[in-house]
Amino acid sequence: MFLLYEYDIFWAFLIISSVIPILAFRISGLLAPTSIGPEKLSSYESGIEPMGDAWLQFRIRYYMFALVFVVFDVETIFLYPWALSFDILGVSVFIEALIFVLILVLGLVYAWRKGALEWS
């Protein structure tokens, strides 16, 4: 039988950890002075008057390179706990991790063939 009273501490922690940031934002919004002037509406560029237009276009290669980096960074985050408990988990988890790595290698090969890793 599933007993919910065993999770009282979890629910209390979840509610408190959700209410505290919401209250902090609400209270700071109520207490903070609000004055809108021309200084506040201008763009900020390292303490200097902005030069030119604030709109800059970036090449899509930067985004593709960053996306591939994030994918493999997340892979490292998922594989680290698995590597620490490798001797306890058994063969089935090893096969699942192998499938996970193979899917990521296929993604790397696809990104490589599409030219996402070339910087020229």
Swiss-Prot record:
The keyword Protein transport does not apply. GO terms for cellular component: chloroplast thylakoid membrane; NADH dehydrogenase complex. The chain crosses the membrane at residues 2-22, 64-84, 88-108. GO terms for biological process: photosynthesis, light reaction. It is an enzyme of class 7 (translocase). Its main location: plastid. Belongs to the complex I subunit 3 family. NDH shuttles electrons from NAD(P)H:plastoquinone, via FMN and iron-sulfur (Fe-S) centers, to quinones in the photosynthetic chain and possibly in a chloroplast respiratory chain. The immediate electron acceptor for the enzyme in this species is believed to be plastoquinone. Couples the redox reaction to proton translocation, and thus conserves the redox energy in a proton gradient. This is NAD(P)H-quinone oxidoreductase subunit 3, chloroplastic.
